[in-house]
Amino acid sequence: DSLILLTGQRGRLKFQNTSHSPVGYALESGFINEEEAIHHEERNLVSNVIGTVGMSIEIGPEMELSPRDTLVLSSDSLPDNLYVDEIVEYVRTGRLERVAARLTGIVEQRMRNPEPGHPGHSDDFTFILYRPAPG
């Protein structure tokens, strides 16, 4: 599964997609919290896979980006290793090259050496950061 997240410079979460999975739907509906979702034994079960016959493509809300918004697109390894509020805090400010290096470092560290009280799941790690150029 993947993460799409949009945050403003001040840290306001403007958009987050719902994971196409039973755990993602349970999280979205409030049946479980983020902590329970990250550690759920079925967190890797997905209900929508690219290239399958039953694949569906959902178009989310149309949103206008502000000059200092940051868009994050990532594989599931980012939300499997950082809480959403941590991701927002890391990406909301700073040069994207530094933000990317910082994200990579903390995710790789948590994959190698999971710490109590923090998520940590070894997996492939892919992400894209985008921020509109100031007008």
What is the meaning of each model-derived region?
Residues 10-60, 104-116:
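PP2C/PPM family metal-dependent serine/threonine protein phosphatase catalytic domain
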Residues 3-4, 22-23, 79:
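Short, catalytically relevant binding-site loops at active-site mouths
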Residues 5, 14-16, 71-74:
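Short hydrophobic-aromatic micro-motifs
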Residues 1, 7-12, 131-135:
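Short acidic-glycine loop/turn motifs at beta-strand connectors
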Residues 48-74, 78-135:
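C-terminal catalytic subdomain
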Residues 7, 33-34, 83-84:
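General structural signal for secondary-structure boundaries
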Residues 1, 10, 19, 75, ...:
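ATP/adenylate-binding site constellation spanning eukaryotic-like Ser/Thr protein kinases
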